[in-house]
């Protein structure tokens, strides 16, 4: 393996939508979003570890994160489950990256914020997005591939967006 991309995630589906207010939160949606967005990627990283410990070439494990998971970048509030799940993903994979650095030295992690991508995930929320800030899946994939091939080798994990801005 030289590149592994974990690109699962959920923001909404039938009966589940981002919470605008604290009063809209409840345990089942919080658990569902956390499980899908944070725990599933961690379990993939766990399952891959035995294979990557014996891998003889550098490998980048990428997970799709989101800037809304940043504590410092949260200026608007809302979206409790999604924000918390992406913050948890960032911390879980940072912790895993440190462990990998000790046991699978050729593995690096990239937490990638793709920006708002024209996809079913963002479709209900695109009305407030400028066309210049709504990216095609092809553009996002090309930016991701470029970043995966150009990481700083001395860092076990990097948080980058499509412009290579540190997140």
Residues covered by each model-derived region:
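Conserved internal alpha-helix within the Rossmann fold of NAD(P)-dependent oxidoreductases
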Residues: 40-45
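Conserved beta-strand scaffold in the Rossmann-like NAD(H)/NADP(H)-binding core
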Residues: 63, 109-111
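Conserved Rossmann-fold cofactor-binding substructure of NAD(P)-dependent oxidoreductases
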Residues: 1
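Active-site-adjacent helical/loop segments in soluble small-molecule enzymes
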Residues: 115
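N-terminal Rossmann-like NAD(P) cofactor-binding module of classical short-chain dehydrogenase/reductase
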Residues: 4-5
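C-terminal helical subdomain
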Residues: 111, 119, 123-167
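Catalytic loop of short-chain dehydrogenase/reductase
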Residues: 10-14, 18-36, 53-103
């Amino acid at each position: 393996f030289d590149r592994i991309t974990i690109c699962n995630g959920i923001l909404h589906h039938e009966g589940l939508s981002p919470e605008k207010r604290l009063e809209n939160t409840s345990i089942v949606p919080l658990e569902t979003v956390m499980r899908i967005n944070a725990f599933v990627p961690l379990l993939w990283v766990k399952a891959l570890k035995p294979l990557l410990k014996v891998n003889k070439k550098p490998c980048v494990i990428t997970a799709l994160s989101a800037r809304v998971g940043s504590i410092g970048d949260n200026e608007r509030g809302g979206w409790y489950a999604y924000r918390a799940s992406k913050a948890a993903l960032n911390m879980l994979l940072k912790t895993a990256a440190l462990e990998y650095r000790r046991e699978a030295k050729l593995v690096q992690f990239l937490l990638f914020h793709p920006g708002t991508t024209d996809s079913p995930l963002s479709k209900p929320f695109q009305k407030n997005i400028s066309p210049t800030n709504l990216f095609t899946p092809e553009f996002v994939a090309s930016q991701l591939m470029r970043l995966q091939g150009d990481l700083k080798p001395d860092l076990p994990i990097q948080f980058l967006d499509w412009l290579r801005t540190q997140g």
